Amino acid sequence: MMVLKVEELVTGKKKGNGDAGEFLPEDFRDGEYEAAVTLEKQEDLKTLPVHFVSLGEQQWKTEKQREAELKKKKLEQRSKLENLEDLEIIIQLKKRKKYKKTKVPVVKEPEPEIVTEPVDVPMFLKAALENKLPVIEKFLSDKNNPDVCDEYKRTALHRACLEGHLAIVEKLIEAGAQIEFRDMLESTAIHWASRGGSLDVLKLLLNKGAKISARDKLLSTPLHVAVRTGHYECAEHLIACEADLNAKDREGDTPLHDAVRLNRYKMIRLLITYGADLNVKNCAGKTPMDLVLHWQNGTKAIFDSLKENSYKASRIAAF
């Protein structure tokens, strides 16, 4: 087996017969190996034996050596990892560099819609549902009546309250829309807000003087509606604003009757916590307890727990 000396490996020269560099792989014949060794060992190759090269080869090797020196300088400029703080600094620098490279897409804000054509009543009512404020503004700026309604006497305010479009509700009220306007079922805006579940709209209506005790054709209050539709935050806000917990609708049902019948456990707990009457009877002579069916175990457990706690409290008070 032929043994090569270190000098032969590095310089590409072979002692004895044969051409220089003929034993090296093709990729290493043009000087890459020398540059790689320079970079890896971080030392100069001036101690290597000098061999004759042409002017072109000398320029090429000079360029390679210059590149190697630049790489060496870059390596020397890198932060040395002496402790965890150094590692953390490097990680932060990497993140910052990556962040700079990441191009943030520029999102253009949609241009405001400008309505120039006259707006008719169907377009106006549809815009209240679809939250198209420019259409609403155009209709109102043309001195039209904000309380125009459809065949069921539902106004734009009713529709906007149902969908929770706060800006449109504000604009309609500013234009003089009647908060207590009643539709065919005698529901007012506060009924529609409770049905839609928008707490912000509900708060706005109450701040503008909407009647919290308003009744529709079924004698339902806004609290009845919020409980039936399961809008907990609206129900809680109505209670906080002193809505009648034991108000009866046309069938004599209180909000608690409705909550029990619909298995709304959170509503049941909310109403009882704030003092709803467990023993009030509806027109059929039924209390909320009487409406609890055998399969409604969750509701029964709540009632049993509350009854037990109230019994213990009464015993303690007796002493």
Curated annotation (Swiss-Prot):
ANK repeats: 152-181, 185-214, 218-247, 251-280, 284-315
Pfam families: Ank_2
GO BP annotations, alphabetical order: cardiac muscle tissue morphogenesis; cellular response to interleukin-1; cellular response to lipopolysaccharide; cellular response to mechanical stimulus; cellular response to transforming growth factor beta stimulus; cellular response to tumor necrosis factor; cellular response to xenobiotic stimulus; negative regulation of DNA biosynthetic process
Subcellular location, principal: nucleus
GO MF annotation, one: transcription coactivator activity
Location(s) in or outside the cell: Nucleus
UniProt-listed Gene3D superfamilies: Ankyrin repeat-containing domain
Keywords in alphabetical order: ANK repeat, Coiled coil, Nucleus, Repeat
InterPro entries in the cross-refs: Ankyrin_rpt (IPR002110), Ankyrin_rpt-contain_sf (IPR036770)
Coiled-coil region: 61-89
Cellular component GO terms, alphabetical: cytosol; fibrillar center; I band; nucleoplasm; nucleus; transcription regulator complex
Source organism, top-level taxon: Eukaryota
Quaternary structure annotation from Swiss-Prot or TrEMBL: Interacts with TTN/titin and YBX1.
Function in brief: May play an important role in endothelial cell activation. May act as a nuclear transcription factor that negatively regulates the expression of cardiac genes.
PANTHER family, sorted: ANKYRIN REPEAT DOMAIN-CONTAINING PROTEIN 1 (PTHR24126:SF7), ANKYRIN REPEAT, PH AND SEC7 DOMAIN CONTAINING PROTEIN SECG-RELATED (PTHR24126)
Protein name per UniProt: Ankyrin repeat domain-containing protein 1
